[in-house]
């Protein structure tokens, strides 16, 4: 059971392996375990296989034609030379199906893997006393998920294949003819149009770049704005890449690195500061997810990171995928809270803007009333929230986000996986017991994570009195990077939550914030507030502060601490 390097903790798109057939630099080769590096006859590096790995399970699959393994666990084989194997057995009592990785040089169940180089898992019957025994092996990713029994699927039955090809060919001729005609017409149209525009493009190239720079003006070290709103949520469809010069590395995550960069303006020395998030080739899926989220024009909001464009680039290190966004010099919220103690006004501003950003993300319409696809972040934490120059928050890092498309089935939602950062996972995510019949349950997990971030803000607010050094949620109870099992013990078994000291409640405003975040991290998902309700509570706090004419005193909050809001 323990031979796979990865056994189903994350969905496949998060653990993509690139099949690189190029030479690894010598200094990298020296740092890699020799058991994990194998080369083929051409000297190219061979990486471990991705296979279904469920060991022995009962199965309803018969030995007619083909069937799926129904194995939900994808494993990266322990050694590069291992291939995917499936074993089907039937005796008087039951049918079992076994899916594993195995070295073809070694016998398995006393049989040699004769077809290890095959791209498909075509079953062959083996002689075993007292049972019917079929086995197959193959060498393409997850090839042991679809197991084939019937000779109809093999080239050894040429007559049947000939009939199939003839029928298929005759059926495809009419639509194929139409498709070819459409392609020819479209090609002629594009060629004619491009000839007309070619001269205009050559003469206007510089002018267009100037217009782009003017509309996308980013104010350097200015408190007014980090980037103009006119350029948010664009995709660079031009073949010409933006003139960007990378400056310094400012952040590094699981999937990408973030650089401060200069967007040059024409041939002058002027430039605008932007952030460039660079994904390596093997993290294409994460880049595409985030790009698709940003591409929604209705996502645009003051508390969501403003997006310029997405690009594919070829470099000396290979193909890279770039996301170009506004740059915020104050960094992420975790870094900011580590370096700074905040006032009550700062807390109110940070908390309010965070709730507004999440509420917009979750909403099915824009502030203007246009229909919008609800989105859940699924990895909310203080390091995925940026602090703007005006001390408001904006959400970033949508690599694990999910669009709540009403056409998604329960199975589609179930396949979205247990994702996020363990420290910030809601109880139902840790326990894998989300209500997939109700898409609101995904939003409720974001609200739980938001509550932990609000607690982080409150713990660094000087309005509560003594302020301790920054500490993440559950900081003293778990290690620096806790695993899911460790968080289960704290959150599920012990029903633990971050501590709220009694002296915090001496400040009426802080008391209301604590009541709000306590309702947001309730163990029952349906009992939690919505992000919109939290935003409304912060708005009322701000309104009461303005009425009082003070910004930092608890007297600005009514003595009874009442707020009239609903969920």
UniProtKB/Swiss-Prot annotation:
Changing residue 526 to Q: In esophageal cancer. InterPro entries: Kinase-like_dom_sf, Prot_kinase_dom, Protein_kinase_ATP_BS, Ser-Thr/Tyr_kinase_cat_dom, Ser/Thr_kinase_AS, Snake_toxin-like_sf, TGFB_receptor, Transform_growth_fac-b_typ-2. Gene3D superfamilies: CD59, Phosphorylase Kinase, domain 1, Transferase(Phosphotransferase) domain 1. Residues 439-567 are annotated as: Sufficient for interaction with CLU. The active site is at residue 379. Changing residue 328 to Y: In a lung neuroendocrine carcinoma sample; somatic mutation. Its cofactor is Mg(2+); Mn(2+). Phosphorylated on a Ser/Thr residue in the cytoplasmic domain. Its EC number is 2.7.11.30. It is a single-pass type I membrane protein. Changing residue 447 to A: In a breast tumor; signaling of TGF-beta significantly inhibited. Belongs to the protein kinase superfamily. TKL Ser/Thr protein kinase family. TGFB receptor subfamily. Homodimer. Heterohexamer; TGFB1, TGFB2 and TGFB3 homodimeric ligands assemble a functional receptor composed of two TGFBR1 and TGFBR2 heterodimers to form a ligand-receptor heterohexamer. The respective affinity of TGFRB1 and TGFRB2 for the ligands may modulate the kinetics of assembly of the receptor and may explain the different biological activities of TGFB1, TGFB2 and TGFB3. Component of a complex composed of TSC22D1 (via N-terminus), TGFBR1 and TGFBR2; the interaction between TSC22D1 and TGFBR1 is inhibited by SMAD7 and promoted by TGFB1. Interacts with DAXX. Interacts with DYNLT4. This is TGF-beta receptor type-2.
